Amino acid sequence: EFIDASFKENIGDPNKINLEFVIKEFEKEYLAKVNVFGNNITEEKVIRDNLEVDEGDPFNKILLMKSINNLKALNIFGKVDYNVTPTSDNDKKKILNITIEEKPTGEISASAGTGTSGGTFGFGIKENNFLGKNISLDSNLRIDEETIRGKFSVVNPNWNYSDRALIASIESSVTDRMGDYGYKTSQTGFSFGSNWEQYDDLYFSPKIAMFHEKLDTNQSASNKLKKQEGDYLDADF
């Protein structure tokens, strides 16, 4: 639609704000071409998938601004600029030039602490734009006096260009309390899910998780723990 919208606010009474929305039709113009510059790492497909406007569409300022905001919301660009120019042969046809500035998307974190239960050490590596496809990878490891826990997760926000996110993770943990309480537990498993907007502001997030858990005990364990000793398979949906 060839419309533009704006609003004016008028503060008359201290406790009231009057908003005036102005919607007007402007001259018919079309988007002839979209150019993308500065994406040395990010695939152009990632950028164009987040645009609300495309070549051949009616030129709409509202959708243009929404497109720019979509790119900024990806959080993989340090700067997003644009300009609109007419074509050389027709003022009614526009060329959209988008210039992005990519920023470092990898993160390394480390943590250490101590308390009444002993010391804790953590380490993590995260990448928010793997292979330039806007895929997030996250791995972390945490170690304390009794427990070792590790997790690796992948998030693809537009799996197979379906507008649906693919979320997968693998994790494992071992808690050894044989010396103090007579038991040791280990848990290993994975989760697999998706997320998408079915209707306006209505999202579906199905997820399945399966874990194998093992409990070992010795003679110093409580009778309750001894009865629970063995292997278990848990599944959640």
Task: Name each region found by the language model.
Residues 1, 52, 72-76:
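Sec-exported extracytoplasmic/periplasmic mature domains
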Residues 1-6, 80:
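Phosphate-interacting basic helix/loop segments used at nucleotide- and nucleic-acid interfaces
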Residues 4-61, 87-122, 162-164:
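Periplasmic POTRA and POTRA-like interaction domains that precede
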Residues 60-237:
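Gram-negative/organellar outer-membrane beta-barrel architecture
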